[in-house]
Regions:
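Sec-exported extracytoplasmic/periplasmic mature domains
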Residues: 92, 107, 111, 124, ...
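Soluble non-cytosolic domains of exported or imported proteins
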Residues: 81-82, 113, 122-129, 148-152, ...
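Entry/capping segment at the start of metal-dependent catalytic domains
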Residues: 3-95, 288-292, 296
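Flexible, polar/acidic helix-loop-strand segments at domain edges
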Residues: 55-58, 159-235, 359, 388, ...
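Second-shell loop/turn segments in exported
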Residues: 73-76, 116-125, 140-145, 200-207, ...
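Extracytoplasmic
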Residues: 59-62, 79-85, 94-102, 114, ...
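Amphipathic, coiled-coil-like alpha-helical scaffolding segments used for oligomerization/assembly
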Residues: 120-179, 247-249
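C-terminal solvent-exposed extensions
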Residues: 51-52, 247-372, 376-378, 384, ...
Length: 402
């Protein structure tokens, strides 16, 4: 699990802890926390017909797009890119949440920019709005809410809780001019960020870095949940306010804290990524259609939406519009046992005004002597010019000529 996944989840934990804490520690904290949440609120316009609303007060399943933005520290002041992109679906009725991590280099359509590019460029081109619209189209689900966090947030939060203590078993190292001593040490925000980011000097490489990242976020959350953390709540709120943007309201967060906690008992985590490809000397991740479809289906089910139609189901629905009753057809957008078996070839018959028509797998055959005006003609099909033509065969003068 990479740094930003840990940071994003850590910040979500902090938000929920703050909301829970205000209920126990008085009106002043309640007022300050309410003000902070109002300060980080930023609505976006969604350009999608996938449905952008979910009633959290009524405990409806909902989705959140989580983004870790690579700006705000190390001299980076531009809008930045979403270095980490995750989609979390939360379903309190099933007591379950699903978290899908999206590789930053996924090649996809950037909605609103009329181009194909890396997924993380959507935020760079159009902020949270373009990122949301792009992910909605990619995953074929509505994105009900979002939370974005910039790089400086980790540093500020470590400072806000008064630092964290770790045991640096790697030995002293320097990253971007910041030296981290060996042994049991107390880290401030600057050294804590370096400790979480360093990879090349760790004998375990990225595995070791992931372990340190997990350690840092766990230490932060533990400090926030402690009495010491509560006493520093104002600094914690300031760190959140300076580094987080979301379209979740204060009431939404109160409802999540009180009505959705059961949904966090089970969290299924998956990674959506494809195969590596270099296109015009640029590295991309190209998604496998089957893996993408599986992820789409998982998320739609978690949100209580109808199952996404497979290509097989789309083909069957195409034939159904011409009055061919196919028993294994699953209409587009519907789910059920029929869709589960749609990959197998089945045979069924239907009466039409023109005669008996049989559909078997992907072929159609009319009963002998019967003419069906709805018969599909493939304009690209090969016709043998030397084949025998029956002079008594009926030819429909209105049939399209190819």
């Amino acid at each position: 699990m990479k740094l930003w996944k840990k940071v994003v989840l850590g910040f979500l934990s902090v938000l929920l802890v703050v909301v829970a804490g205000v209920c126990a520690y008085g009106i002043k904290m309640y007022s300050d926390a309410n003000s902070t949440i109002n300060g980080i609120y930023q609505s976006v316009n969604r350009k999608s017909n996938k449905g952008a609303t979910a009633n959290i007060d009524a405990q409806e399943p909902f989705s959140v797009l989580l983004m870790g933005i690579d700006t705000g520290d190390l001299g980076r002041t531009e809008q930045g890119r979403s270095d980490t992109t995750m989609v979390v679906t939360i379903n309190p009725k099933e007591n379950k949440s699903t978290m899908i991590s999206l590789d930053r280099d996924i090649l996809t359509d950037i909605v609103g920019n009329d181009t194909q590019d890396k997924l993380n460029h959507a935020y760079a081109f159009g902020g949270a709005e373009m990122a949301i619209n792009t992910v909605q189209e990619l995953l074929d689900i509505p994105i009900h809410h979002y939370v974005s966090i910039n790089m400086k947030g980790l540093k500020d939060l470590i400072d806000a809780v008064g630092g964290i203590e770790v045991d640096n078993t790697i030995g002293e190292f320097t990253l971007d001019g910041i030296t981290v001593p060996a042994g049991k040490i107390k880290l401030d925000g600057t050294t804590g960020l370096a400790y979480a980011r360093m990879r090349h000097e760790d004998p375990e490489g990225d595995v070791g870095r992931q372990r340190r990242q997990r350690e840092v976020v766990e230490k932060i959350v533990r400090k926030v949940m402690s009495f010491d953390g509560v006493s520093k709540y104002r600094k914690i709120l300031d760190a959140v306010e300076a580094n987080v943007k979301t379209d979740l309201t204060w009431d939404d967060m109160m409802d999540i804290q009180s009505k959705y906690l059961s949904a966090f008992k089970t969290i299924d985590s998956e990674q959506l990524q494809g195969y590596s490809a270099t296109i015009d000397d640029i590295y991309y991740q190209v998604l496998d259609p089957n893996s993408l479809y599986k992820t789409q289906t998982t998320l739609r089910k978690q949100l209580g939406l109808k199952e996404h139609a497979s290509e097989r189901e789309k083909d069957l629905a195409f034939y159904n519009q011409f009055s061919y009753a196919v028993t294994d057809t699953a209409l587009i957008g519907e789910s059920g046992d029929s869709s589960a078996n749609s990959s197998t070839s089945s045979s069924s018959t239907a009466d039409t005004s023109a005669g008996q028509t049989e559909y078997n797998g992907n072929t159609q055959q009319a009963a002998e002597g019967a003419y069906d005006p709805n018969t599909y003609v493939d304009p690209n099909a090969y016709t043998d010019p030397n084949a025998y033509a029956d002079p008594n065969t009926y030819v429909d003068p209105n049939a399209p000529q190819y």
